[in-house]
Amino acid sequence: MGNDISLIALLAFSTLLPFIIASGTCFVKFSIVFVMVRNALGLQQIPSNMTLNSVALLLSMFVMWPIMHDAYVYFEDEDVTFNDISSLSKHVDEGLDGYRDYLIKYSDRELVQFFENAQLKRQYGEETETVKRDKDEIEKPSIFALLPAYALSEIKSAFKIGFYLYLPFVVVDLVVSSVLLALGMMMMSPVTISTPIKLVLFVALDGWTLLSKGLILQYMDIAT
């Protein structure tokens, strides 16, 4: 019976793992930024979605490694077993403290407060003094409240970064369009000229490397 419970728990975790990686790590930001940069360059399928997602996944694993390592060390030291509910609950509360701190640090505080209050209202059925707590008083929010807050915060941050990255490429498109109009070449598509120019500039600046470094440096203090 114990082995059956362990197998069910393992299968359930394996099913949820892709969703946790996609929305509960920095993968969500990396993948969105990479796709937006590709679109800003005027390239539709180069690099492919698989390539961009693979690079985003590798960078995310590099960033999240300290947190995964701490959780694994706790798992080994405390001898957590899948057929013991109390052991799993303790692992979520204590073994994932590093991950909880990561989620708190990179989540919008207002979103954390919203989901925490919504969870408490759903649990108690009405507003209580606990629900009315100030956001600074929440010491240890639930991971289930932190995950949606973190995902939305990362999406918002990714779109901000994408906007700033889009601007110089839009300027190139506008300049090329103005030059073609001034030369009377209205029949020529500006994309035909602007795309090679944007590619040359991006490659000359080593854009993918600079972009990856900039994204990673935002998370380099998570192990401290």
UniProtKB/Swiss-Prot annotation:
This is Surface presentation of antigens protein SpaP. Belongs to the FliP/MopC/SpaP family. It holds the Pfam family FliP. GO terms for biological process: protein secretion. It comes from the Bacteria. The chain crosses the membrane at residues 8-28, 55-75, 161-181, 185-205. Keywords: Cell membrane, Membrane, Transmembrane, Transmembrane helix, Virulence. It is a multi-pass membrane protein. One of its GO terms (cellular component) is plasma membrane. It is found in: Cell membrane. Involved in a secretory pathway responsible for the surface presentation of determinants needed for the entry of Salmonella species into mammalian cells. Signal peptide: none annotated. The keyword Transmembrane applies. It comes from Salmonella typhi. InterPro entries: T3SS_IM_P, T3SS_YscR-like.
